[in-house]
């Protein structure tokens, strides 16, 4: 019965695709697929352009040497944007003795992640084998997200880069509060914009407290960003361009980007709304016993069958979306299914580093002990 339902969905999808090919009708339903005019298909293997095309252009090189840059790529397997290195230079000027703590007093932010490498902290690590895929990787952080700043410990607020592919520069800087939800909120296309956005929000909350220090820091941030040609917009032109390529928002809200060709091959929507899927996942996670849980898994198992059909027809985005939604739900009951779906999606999309990050994270997914440089 389940196979017949899957076959029916496959046939319906084929018919829809033929109709779209002929008439280019507007999509309806859960994750509105963009028409070709606004959604550019990816390059050859589905990877995005390697550099962002937005307001932040022709940024001069920072003082960070090539040796440190090479070490960063070796440890993270990711290329860092130039604004990260400029922000390090900026914080060294603010607080030469402790650049990573330069924003602690005024904003309560601590520089971590790649900044730990720039500070040489990894050379004195208490952990003999730190895994930088897991360094400050919070419970809901998808492989696309890389933490660079820590905020409130209470809410596990953190700020990081979000990449659509491992070999592209970040699409934006976002924030998440892991104790509250999986939601990732966009803050700008570079770390200066993100910190300014956070500063302006803090100033409203704090009132007159530290007003002078915040004002001084704001002026310095604006001056440096302007000198470097970095945009301080919270939503740049480049980010708006990316929004047009997002095929679906997913539970974390930041959206996923997959290449979709002129025949609409690359992504097909899930047969459930977000609310419907969450209801299914809730029934599984909160089942009173194993028998109830196995029964509740039925609708999800059916969707996995649909994903297999989608992968056969090169609609890799469907498995990517379902796997990401399961990951964002946060329950360990879905780890086995996530391992079925997401590494396969990343492999088909040629985003293998994200698959490596995911595997490492699922093996050690926690709210605690996130500093890979401390003793484990």
Task: Describe the role of every protein-language-model region.
Residues 2, 25-162, 310-376:
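A surface-exposed partner-binding patch
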Residues 5-6, 13:
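Ala/Thr-enriched low-complexity intrinsically disordered regions
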Residues 13-23:
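Compositionally biased low-complexity segments, especially N-terminal hydrophobic helices
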Residues 113-116, 190, 273:
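Short, solvent-exposed coil/turn linker segments
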Residues 167-221:
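Compact, glycine/acidic-enriched structural inserts
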Residues 205-376:
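Charge-dense, low-complexity intrinsically disordered regions
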């Amino acid at each position: 019965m389940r196979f017949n339902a899957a076959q029916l969905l496959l046939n319906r999808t084929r018919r829809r695709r033929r109709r779209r090919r002929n008439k280019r009708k507007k999509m309806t339903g859960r994750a509105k697929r963009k028409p070709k005019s606004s959604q550019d298909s990816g390059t050859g293997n589905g990877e995005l352009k390697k550099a962002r095309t937005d307001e932040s252009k022709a940024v001069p090189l920072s003082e960070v040497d090539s040796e440190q840059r090479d070490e960063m790529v070796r440890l993270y397997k990711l290329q860092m944007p130039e604004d990260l290195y400029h922000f390090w230079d900026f914080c060294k000027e603010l607080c030469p003795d402790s650049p990573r703590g330069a924003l602690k007093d005024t904003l309560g932010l601590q520089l971590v992640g790649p900044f730990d490498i720039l500070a040489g902290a990894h050379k004195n690590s208490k952990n003999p084998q730190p895994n930088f895929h897991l360094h400050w990787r919070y419970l809901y952080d998808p492989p696309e997200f890389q933490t660079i700043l820590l905020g409130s410990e209470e809410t596990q607020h953190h700020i990081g880069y979000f990449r659509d592919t491992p070999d592209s520069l970040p699409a934006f800087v976002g924030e998440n509060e892991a104790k509250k939800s999986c939601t990732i909120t966009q803050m700008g296309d570079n770390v200066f914009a993100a910190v300014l956005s956070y500063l302006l929000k803090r100033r409203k909350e704090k009132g007159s407290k530290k007003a002078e220090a915040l004002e001084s820091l704001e002026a310095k941030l604006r001056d440096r960003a302007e000198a470097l040609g970095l945009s301080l917009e919270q939503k740049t032109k480049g980010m708006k361009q990316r929004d047009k390529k997002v095929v679906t928002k997913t539970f974390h809200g930041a959206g996923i980007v997959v290449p979709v060709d002129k025949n609409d091959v690359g992504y097909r929507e899930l047969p459930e709304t977000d609310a419907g899927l969450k209801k299914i996942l809730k029934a599984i996670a909160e089942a009173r016993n194993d028998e109830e849980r196995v029964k509740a898994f039925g609708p999800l198992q059916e969707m996995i069958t649909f994903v297999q059909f989608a992968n056969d027809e090169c609609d890799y985005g469907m498995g990517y979306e379902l796997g990401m939604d399961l990951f964002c739900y946060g329950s360990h009951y879905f780890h086995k299914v996530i391992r079925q779906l997401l590494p396969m999606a990343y492999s088909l999309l040629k985003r293998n580093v994200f698959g490596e990050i995911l595997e490492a994270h699922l093996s050690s997914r926690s709210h605690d002990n996130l500093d890979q440089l401390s003793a484990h």
